[in-house]
Amino acid sequence: MNIQAILSEKVSQALIAAGAPADSEAHIRQSAKAQFGDYQANGVMAAAKKVGMPPRQLAEKVVNLLNLQGIASKVEIAGPGFINIFLDKAWIAANIETALKDEKLGVTPAKPQTIVVDYSAPNVAKQMHVGHLRSTIIGDAAVRTLEFLGHKVIRANHVGDWGTQFGMLIAYLEKVQNENASDMALSDLEAFYREAKKHYDEDEEFAIRARGYVVKLQGGDEYCRTMWRKLVDITMAQNQQTYDRLNVTLTKDSVMGESLYNDLLPSIVADLKQQGLAVESDGATVVYLDEYKNKEGEPMGVIIQKQDGGYLYTTTDIACAKYRYETLHADRILYYIDSRQHQHLMQAWTIVRKAGYVPESVSLEHHMFGMMLGKDSKPFKTRAGGTVRLTDLLDEAIERANTLIREKNPDMPEDELKKVVSAVGIGAVKYADLSKSRTTDYIFDWDNMLAFEGNTAPYMQYAYTRVASIFKRAEIDESSLTLPVILNEDREQTLATRLLQFEETITTVAREGTPHVMCAYLYDLAGLFSCFYEHCQILNAESEELRQSRLKLALLTAKTLKQGLNTLGIETVERM
């Protein structure tokens, strides 16, 4: 149930009935302070301006026409024309009951769409590094959220599995006569990559041979294809181990690398020429875009085919968007790629729209993100200044969590300890990232992310175990809770109202790709429960009716925390 949507519809109807234009919006917001009610309608001022009426006068007309019977106990006008809405206790209680009986916690399924989510995108023959973390975990949180709401989600891991580097690798592997590539570890491949690059830069004969292998590979040469496939398979097998450790839902079936679009590129270039969008310029094929200007103020030229016949990332991205609409039948396409790629993507999509490959009805969205920084506010590096491998980062997270949990639970059985350490260590790394707005850079800090205070994974995981332990300790089965929810105390009502705002939260995350909104909601919910727990007796409540009612609030809190963390890919544990 989406309270915001319900109130928005009701207030908008009243606004229009009061004489406001048909496109008037209620602008319903959760109230910042209890004195302003549970929700506030802020749309009257804008509507009043359009109809030339004093805002307060329009607000009075709206309130008189507003039918919130059974939903609100009180509606007030404040200031110049704000409408404060106080929800009815009985209505809140009834909806808590409904949410408890529903495996989706009262969340209304969305109208299903086919949504392609492009995320992670590591490169072949290279180990994943911290630069891949944000795309991987933010994208996966989006996928989990969209699937929870009932959408058909297609995971697209746009792996860098094509290009000049494969000519270099194949040429160098041949040079050292190591054709049995499948026996190599990925660390060996990285060493090969460095050596191949060195030879490519310093040995012109080697570079010519490498470029020749690229042509052969693109032409379908069997030997080159076999070597290429081995390199891809070794890389993705290693990456899958990282995905599994991260509790990320990507699999081998999610791989849709650059190579997938190779066969589409010639026809796309030909079609863009035929449509008059692309022209020849100094032997290359270029699309000039009026929307983007160069330094001279002239339309910017976007190259889609080089003089030597080679294609560029833009060409692949055009083909990629076309494929996702025409073949995958996407209604919405989300890209979790860092902010530095924004102009590149916008140019590719401008061409896609002009060519008619993807209609305006299909949303193309770049959910960009900032960088992960060290405490010095510079890009996160090793002490030696090198790139931090993702496996090394996760190893350190486990090591630090192990020390932390052992100190708190010296007698915990080893098998249980291992599960808790993994959940806390990996969860801490993920939550530290997901709890920050994805559009900004953030500081990576071990001490903060592993703290049991503040908006951290350990705090949230502990908050869940604390609530769940109430039922475990008292050996209470939820089926025994047969009495209705009653809300006598303010803290009970505040907690109950916040619980009912889960759908508003998850809908926002799905619409905007902002998992930090879910983190903020869960953190606030945990704080409200803590306040409720300290001031309202649960197991020793003064009556059985009150005891069961408060247990129901605790139960829905536990379920909401668990489900919310699950949409973020954060595991919960029963004991910490």
UniProtKB/Swiss-Prot annotation:
Reactions performed catalytically: tRNA(Arg) + L-arginine + ATP = L-arginyl-tRNA(Arg) + AMP + diphosphate
Does the keyword field hold ATP-binding?
Answer: yes
Enzyme nomenclature, EC number? 6.1.1.19
Report if keyword Membrane is assigned: no
The places in or outside the cell where this protein is found are: Cytoplasm
Motif 'HIGH' region mapped to chain: 122-132
The record's InterPro entries line, in alphabetical order, gives:
aa-tRNA-synth_I_CS, Arg-tRNA-ligase, Arg-tRNA-synth_N, Arg-tRNA-synth_N_sf, ArgRS_core, DALR_anticod-bd, Rossmann-like_a/b/a_fold, tRNAsynth_Ia_anticodon-bd
Cross-referenced SUPFAM superfamilies, in alphabetical order?
Anticodon-binding domain of a subclass of class I aminoacyl-tRNA synthetases, Arginyl-tRNA synthetase (ArgRS), N-terminal 'additional' domain, Nucleotidylyl transferase
A GO BP term here is: arginyl-tRNA aminoacylation
Provide this UniProt record's keywords sorted from A to Z.
Answer: Aminoacyl-tRNA synthetase, ATP-binding, Cytoplasm, Ligase, Nucleotide-binding, Protein biosynthesis
| Cysteines joined through disulfide linkages | none
* Top-level taxon of the source organism: Bacteria
What Gene Ontology terms describe what this protein does at the molecular function level?
A: arginine-tRNA ligase activity; ATP binding
* Record-linked Pfam families: Arg_tRNA_synt_N, DALR_1, tRNA-synt_1d
The enzyme's main class, written as a single word, is ligase
**GO CC terms in record:** cytoplasm
Q: Which family does it belong to?
A: Belongs to the class-I aminoacyl-tRNA synthetase family.
- Indicate the quaternary assembly: Monomer.
Q: What is this protein called?
A: Arginine--tRNA ligase
Organism annotation? Photorhabdus laumondii subsp. laumondii (strain DSM 15139 / CIP 105565 / TT01) (Photorhabdus luminescens subsp. laumondii)
